[in-house]
From Swiss-Prot:
One of its GO terms (biological process) is protein refolding. Keywords: ATP-binding, Chaperone, Nucleotide-binding, Stress response. This is Chaperone protein HscC. Belongs to the heat shock protein 70 family. The keyword Nucleotide-binding applies. Probable chaperone. Has ATPase activity. Not stimulated by DnaJ. Induction: By heat shock. Activated up to a temperature of 40 degrees Celsius, after which levels decrease. InterPro entries: ATPase_NBD (IPR043129), Heat_shock_70_CS (IPR018181), HscC_NBD (IPR042030), HSP70_peptide-bd_sf (IPR029047), Hsp_70_fam (IPR013126).
Amino acid sequence: MDNAELAIGIDLGTTNSLIAVWKDGAAQLIPNKFGEYLTPSIISMDENNHILVGKPAVSRRTSHPDKTAALFKRAMGSNTNWRLGSDTFNAPELSSLVLRSLKEDAEEFLQRPIKDVVISVPAYFSDEQRKHTRLAAELAGLNAVRLINEPTAAAMAYGLHTQQNTRSLVFDLGGGTFDVTVLEYATPVIEVHASAGDNFLGGEDFTHMLVDEVLKRADVARTTLNESELAALYACVEAAKCSNQSPLHIRWQYQEETRECEFYENELEDLWLPLLNRLRVPIEQALRDARLKPSQIDSLVLVGGASQMPLVQRIAVRLFGKLPYQSYDPSTIVALGAAIQAACRLRSEDIEEVILTDICPYSLGVEVNRQGVSGIFSPIIERNTTVPVSRVETYSTMHPEQDSITVNVYQGENHKVKNNILVESFDVPLKKTGAYQSIDIRFSYDINGLLEVDVLLEDGSVKSRVINHSPVTLSAQQIEESRTRLSALKIYPRDMLINRTFKAKLEELWARALGDEREEIGRVITDFDAALQSNDMARVDEVRRRASDYLAIEIP
């Protein structure tokens, strides 16, 4: 088997990321350097300007929030930057560091280089967000041969073991995004009927709202907490939220005082009601677009870590009147599905034939002038149209002596183009005829997100423009410069990561503690630093073990 035949799938998540491979007739998760499947999507820079990715960076959100970045997937497609130490990074660059770490883990596990991968993205990601995802892959030295929608990837993993004709709804609530997809299984075909979503609704929003309520109950203004204190509070609230206990008990520190509060289920439901109601909107839209009622859904598939929150599950059960399908881990199924799609793409001999039909999750069209009103959006391909697809609409020039037209291509669902996303703009020259001219504009869209626009004029000439999701927003030189800069960054040595992660955990505990407890942890840190400086690994292991027992810390 040569390198090109490796079927690799990646779930590049807001909170955690995973990588999987199709191997020995099944999709398998690849462990990271800590033997874990979930790699936190967090980047930090230490005092020696080493980049820390994943678990070693988690604790530094509390101890060094000014040098740590998280939730950057939410900024894909924007101009947001993060400053870590003396360096500045954008969302694709930070994402590329996560992808690079996953790539190294896979190459270590498989003992072979990898290049071509299938990467999952939220179904409702815009064209620009998809471009940034491809750019992140390129900066990491990977080739994203396919971007697969996250609910569709989950359906691939679920559908591979579903030998029956069923209609399913995939409810995908991750750390930062929410997607709903309605599918139908008719072996061996998986047909996507409709998708809807909210790119700014996820588990982090529930955490943020809970933090605000904790501060309100304590009569503490958010502005009185420094970055480290606020990060420590977020960590406490997130841990309590993920415990799914009832009542939810939160214990945190403020100005050398321990604060505690409890939230009962009815209180959480009242608090989170605005977010829970937002979950209904994409569900109702997807069902409406698929022309189905909740009672016509045969199975409910929950995906994403936040979908495991009891109140979220209760909302889903109320809407559909049935319990969710539970025979998989919702945090890992997307990566497995991406690997299955990669295997299907390579036509691996040891995989059953699976035919996937997907949809365009958003409407694509052009800007027109109607009755003297400019800036009107005219859809050519409506949202949730099965792809590949080709559609044509006929338009007319605005003036008899018009010598050119500007084709502004937009995506979105708003009547006004100013509220949609501009995808591309180009001019088409016309021959003056002294009369109004009829113009046909054809959109052809394929499963890889490639859009071809054909403008057919009255004289029979055609002007074509191909719009794809390659990172065209940067020049080849700019991409190469960014790749070179990222490659020059010093990634913390793999063989020392366990000790670095343990040190970060000690620093996090010190940042949270107060008084005598803080002093004791400080002494432990001093002992551990001295052991590290001695380069005596036996001594390092012994100090780490004693510190772990004394402070009840899990050794990574």
